[in-house]
């Protein structure tokens, strides 16, 4: 099956988590917006004939299925791409971890747009500075510390055990994103999460 990934052409964003899984598995897929432009994504969202219309990208077309929301897409793709545990409990555990990553993505976004997404970063700098301070003081230690604990208890080198899963790829992308957005803060913090960084390096 050839998958179709719909996102925006100029940013990695939430679409990158899906893209990483497709690339890791060597899946047959087309990155629609990067091939045909953003109008293709907008057109799919606006299509009135859909019984279950997607709210926003990323969106994956898999045959007749149209699946939206990053964690939902990965929950579908994981077993099919060999990037998820085989048993139901393991698949739900991977999904639970991905949903936690989804929460973290929202918090990272809000450090730059704490007031509203409709304003430019430059229009909300004071609020962004405050949000960033709280983010690094409270949220990063709690959430990345949680993943450090998960790795310590997983029984292997990966979040779900001994095999690479889509959640490992997503945590890799989180580290990459934090290094890009907050290079100095992340460099200081990394010594507190050696297992997470080791996972990043393995991926």
Regions found by a protein language model. Give the residues of each.
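GST-like domain detector, emphasizing the conserved glutathione-binding G-site
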Residues: 1-134, 153, 159
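Domain-wide signal for the mature, well-folded portions of proteins, strongly enriched
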Residues: 15, 112-115, 119, 141, ...
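Structural helix-adjacent loops and short alpha-helical linkers that scaffold large soluble proteins
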Residues: 85-88, 185-191
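GST superfamily/GST-like fold recognition
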Residues: 94, 159-184, 192-197, 203
């Amino acid at each position: 099956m050839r998958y179709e990934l719909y996102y925006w052409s100029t940013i990695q964003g939430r679409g990158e988590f899906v893209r990483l899984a497709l690339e890791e598995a060597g899946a047959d897929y087309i990155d629609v917006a990067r091939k045909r432009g953003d109008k293709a994504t907008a057109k799919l969202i606006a299509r009135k004939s859909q019984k279950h219309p997607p709210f926003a990208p990323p969106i994956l077309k898999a045959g007749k299925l149209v699946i939206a929301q990053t964690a939902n897409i990965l929950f579908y793709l994981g077993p099919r791409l060999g990037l998820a545990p085989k048993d139901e409990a393991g698949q739900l555990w991977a999904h639970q971890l991905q949903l936690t990553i989804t929460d973290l993505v929202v918090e990272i976004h809000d450090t730059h747009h704490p007031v509203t997404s409709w304003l430019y970063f430059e229009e909300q700098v004071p609020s962004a500075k405050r949000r960033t301070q709280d983010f690094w003081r409270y949220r990063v230690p709690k959430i990345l510390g949680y993943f450090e604990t998960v790795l310590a208890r997983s029984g292997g080198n990966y979040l779900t055990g001994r095999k690479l899963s889509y959640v490992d790829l997503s945590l890799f992308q989180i580290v990459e994103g934090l290094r890009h957005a907050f290079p100095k803060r992340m460099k200081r913090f990394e010594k507190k999460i050696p297992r997470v960084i080791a996972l990043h390096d393995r991926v």
